[in-house]
Amino acid sequence: MIEGLDNPRLDELYPMEVGELRDGVELIRGASHPFELDSFLAGMQTPVFFGSGINNFGVQEILEALVQWAPPPQPRDAGARMVQPTEKAFTGFVFKIQANMDPKHRDRIAFLRVCSGMYESGMKVRHLRLNRDMKLGNALTFMANERVASERAFAGDIIGIHNHGQLQIGDTLTEGETLGFKGIPYFAPELFRYARARDPMKAKQLQKGLEQLGEEGAIQVLQTPTGRLLLGAVGVLQFEIVAHRLQTEYQVDALYDPADIQTARWLAFPDDATRKRFERDQQMRLASDVDGNPVYLANSRYNLQVTMEDWPDVGFIATREHGQRLEQG
């Protein structure tokens, strides 16, 4: 092993390449900040590793850094209080949903992070959003394409739960305590397209596919007064990815039509009377999201600003938590 860029052995063994190596390292050092472990643990800094998996170069260094630097499970904000990872009672939240991980079985997996306590296969937990008990069983852990059944999991572990529609991103599961883990933001979309199937006979497949992809968070699916499927995104690439997945996973060739919408905001009303007046006045500019929250669709920034000024008591919200049902009055 050769240690240090100034080691003369480098010049002996690699006389043609050593100059470029030193220049490259100097450039990287000049363009970045020195690594500080405290900043990394505080979420203020991310280390960058250079390597190649196919050449097995740098892989060992990444693994060693994970072992050395990765922090233990941290306390998490659950709304009513902070949940400590050392607590005995089980708590966890769903942070990701992935459909069709096994295309042969059309399965959907909800990825759940255990925040405290211990998961045991077959245990009964409280689903806070649905306000009912459910049984957790047949959990999985993943390594590349391999799945392994998990009988137990502890704070900091991530397990996959077979999902038949009862779990959504942001859902909190506990052994009975009323909590709600936070920190999974949902941003108001800035780009919009109407979706339709090239083959009208596949309209139901399109609807089902978009519902499942919407549950993942791959795209936002909004229900409009006209019944047309409206998709909202924060980047153009989302539309391309969704079209590709609809074709490969649901055998639906989707087409996009332009929408006269520039931005959107979730709505929060102070009382039922205000809500009804707003709905009468803005009927054709309203939609609802996957969680049933009302959404205002603005055809311009100016239109949004004027509407906000005309309705000062109504909350126009640009960011909300995943799975959050906004209180209305």
Task: Give the residues covered by each predicted segment.
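Structural and coupling elements of P-loop NTPases
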Residues: 1-329
